[in-house]
């Protein structure tokens, strides 16, 4: 009996050691269902573009920062819904502009800078909600390509410091 009790006691102790907390976490899931032929990839729906450190002297000489890609990835485009489209998808951008310049997105931080975005065809984006040209959409995944850069704001005075800007985009399928 003593051997059985000792064995049971040892088993209980050893199980207690194995049950120690070896890590845990929480997984949150979220998303949005939209009424559209395509979904928007998460990395496209909420983007941050970092321009790094830009030379004030270069911007003062009418230079621009290094151009960065700004892509909007459409995913799981449904063939049936795409077949109903006449033109494709148009993208419009909104944001705070500077000095009435609709193609210059204003920045915060009093640096005298503006953000410019160009569509793949080279046309500059307006931040007043005006939609650009329609892009045909195919079944599956599609990427709407833009480039963006920083420049001296029209009528602005450049100052050193950090800046930020926010633009929103909206898709309209036609």
Question: Positions of the model-derived regions?
Answer:
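Mature extracellular/passenger domains of Gram-negative fimbrial/pilin and adhesin proteins
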Residues: 1-3, 17-174
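Bacterial N-terminal signal peptides
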Residues: 6-14
